[in-house]
Amino acid sequence: MSIETLVNDYKVKTTRSRQMYEEALQVMPGGNSRTTTFFDPYPFYIARGAGPRIWDADGTERLDFNGNYTSLILGHAHASVVEAVTEQATRGMSFPGPSEHEVKLAESLTKRLPSMEAVRFVNSGTEATMNAVRAARAFTGRSKIAKFEGAYHGTHDGVLVSVSPDPAKSGSRKRPKPVAYSAGVPDTVLKHTVVLPWNDADACAKILEKQGRDLAALIVDPLMANAGLLVPQLGFLERLREVTDRLGIMLIFDEVISFRVSEGGAQQRFGIRPDLTTLGKIIGGGLAVGAFGGRSEVMNAYDPRGGKGKISHGGTFNANPVTMAGGVATMKELTPEAYAKLDALGDRLRAGVTRVLAKSKQPAQVTGLGSLFWIHWTKKRLSDYRSSRPTEAERPLRTFLGLLNDGVLLTQRGLGCCSLAMTDADVDRFVETFGRVVAKDGG
């Protein structure tokens, strides 16, 4: 089905969203506040959500496999989270000091993550990675950081490098060149950033050993979520841990997305103990949140007692009590049984999508782990950013719009997730709908 036909169908279904978009354009560039949620001809505006479903401004119901970009692990408006948030809101929305919920959430996270000996809260994953990088620089006395080509770690300047670069302009596969992701990123940031190729342990080791004396940290998304959910090859993360240990480089695990794959995140699943960890998304129950923590001797730089704190850490809404209450309620729901259900839903969905693709004989595949999945429109082996980068940008968009018009929400690039609010029937509906979309698009 052509993109024009899909767009026309979308316009017919979203007349109120179009009106709201035109109103929004008068006061906001692009009509909203998140680049990721925009798509042509305009984004649909969401009125409410409940369980695994959302309803847009036109009243259209959709099954939500986006989950606010993987953050709603319990689904929308989970009863225990709503109760906790409402109860706290009646006692106060924000305070000029800490609260009991902050302590309880910190205790829950440090129990789940043994590497996180101490933790502090912020308001987003971006703030979490920004502070983790700062802590690593303060502890090591070094200025450079290393990251992987294709990895996303938030929107602060220090990590907006080689997020989705054009391979023709970013050096060789084994020695990627740092490329600014956005206008406004200073050249000095590029000079302080070393870029590595995912899943190439030997190439990474060579680069790290050459730059080691200047590197404060290596920041890693263990699932490379931005590049297509590329599970690390056997021994790859272990090699990174060995090399960074030997060279005195802080290993930061960015688990803003990957924390949903087990009680102890990807570090538990893969058996790696990082020096620092960043969290966000699921730990706030749907409210704005971030956290960073790790080795106590590193985190001590944030301890203000006796004037010994090396790093000032402020934020009017850090550890907001309403957010903390939602986080505590969410963590209570994330039991071993809950993760077993999430894994089963993810396995069922990936198996179903694989069957659809095999029947269609179209060049595509699905990657992922636990409750996360990503549909790629290529059959080539996916190992790093360059191999997973789409060669045809329109095909993922056609899939997104086809699903959207048929009552299922994914992300525009193909990333999706299951929530605890879902059932096998919800997953089967996704697979059936995906099958119809593929069949209409040449399959």
Feature-to-residue mapping (PLM):
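Conserved N-terminal phosphate-binding loop of PLP-dependent enzymes in the Aspartate aminotransferase
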Residues: 1-443
